[in-house]
Regions:
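Conserved, well-folded catalytic cores of nucleic-acid-processing
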Residues: 18-22, 54-58, 108, 131, ...
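Well-ordered alpha-helical segments embedded in enzymatic catalytic cores
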Residues: 15, 87, 124-127, 246
Length: 319
């Protein structure tokens, strides 16, 4: 699970390259015991415009990648593709994948399923478990995280904690506050000790004249999702406190006890050496003039702010 735009799909391309072509990297340093096909249910990214270049950049064997999109299925049948549809089981039987990816899960759930309902989610995922058992394949379920602040691990998965319970392994992705690096934290492993957290960044690349992106391995850390979330919370609190203190210091040292917007902004920036903290305070955008009489407003504001196409199974490739 991860927030939108973190890079789930870009890292996922590295996994697909590993499964289809046996491509090793910092992400997957040991050769796989076997390689095979990947069946990708894509609910958001277009195969021709996005996925093909991304997978080529990662080194995937495109002859072993099969993509079924929610939009294309609806265009052909007039019905949304859901996990319970027999069509999905039929596609999987023809493809014989080693790995089945559902990205994201929300795009392939029946409309009447409430993700917060444990019973409904278990029933909705039963057909997927049956496919995995019949085909002998692994399943990767991709989810967006929720918008709750200050939560990590299990609490970050959108709506349904039951998915955490059913999954044998859970990965959480996020972005570090201090240096902006992306992390992939192994939060749960039902069969062994969770592995170290992977650090990565994303490079812009060009493949066959098409601009795309590629995940680049940076190293490992023992920090987990909760550590990064706590770091973000602490740094935000420190930034707000620094901004508040700087505003009060500048105003208290002013000879007139007041200062026009541009002068106050410049003085505060010099005081705290951080324009982002001032922006997050959002105080100056609300008041054209700050005075000592407005200190209570400054305190409150600083406290509240914070400074085309898809491949058929028969073709076994993306067109």
């Amino acid at each position: 699970g991860a927030d939108g735009g973190t890079g789930k799909g870009i890292w996922q391309a590295q996994l697909i390259a590993y499964v289809t072509a046996g491509k090793t990297s910092g992400f997957f340093p040991l050769p796989p015991q076997q390689t095979g096909k990947v069946l990708l249910l894509a609910g958001e990214d277009d195969p021709g415009k996005v996925l093909k270049a991304r997978l080529l950049a990662a080194g995937a064997d495109m002859n072993r990648v099969l993509v079924l999109t929610a939009d294309d299925y609806f265009g052909k049948t007039g019905q949304p593709l859901t996990l319970k549809d027999q069509a999905l089981a039929d596609f999987a039987a023809k493809a014989g994948p080693l790995l089945l990816i559902v990205d994201p899960l929300q795009s392939f759930l029946p409309a009447d399923v409430e993700m917060a309902s444990r019973n409904q989610m278990r029933s909705a995922l039963l057909p997927l478990r049956a496919i995995a058992a019949k085909q002998g394949c692994a399943v990767l379920i991709v989810m967006h995280s929720n918008k709750k602040q200050g939560v990590s691990g299990r609490a970050r998965l959108a709506d349904s904690s039951d998915i955490w319970d059913m999954a044998r392994s859970v990965l959480m992705m996020g972005r570090a506050k201090n240096d902006g690096k992306i992390y992939l934290s192994h939060e749960k492993n039902s069969y062994a000790r969770p592995q170290q957290t992977v650090l990565l960044h994303i490079d812009d690349v060009e493949v066959e004249g098409v601009k795309t992106a590629r995940a680049v391995f940076d190293g490992y850390t023992d920090k987990k999702d909760a550590d990064f979330i706590e770091e973000r919370r602490v740094r935000t609190a420190e930034t707000r406190q620094d901004t508040r203190s700087a505003i009060l210091n500048v105003l208290s040292e002013s000879r007139l006890g007041s200062m026009a917007n541009p002068q106050l902004k410049s003085a505060v920036l010099q005081e705290i050496k951080c324009s982002e903290a001032l922006t997050n305070a959002r105080m100056l955008s609300l008041y054209g003039m700050a005075t000592l009489q407005n200190i209570s407003c400054a305190k409150r504001t600083a406290r509240e702010g914070g400074l085309p196409g898809w491949p058929t199974v028969e073709k076994h490739m993306i067109q």
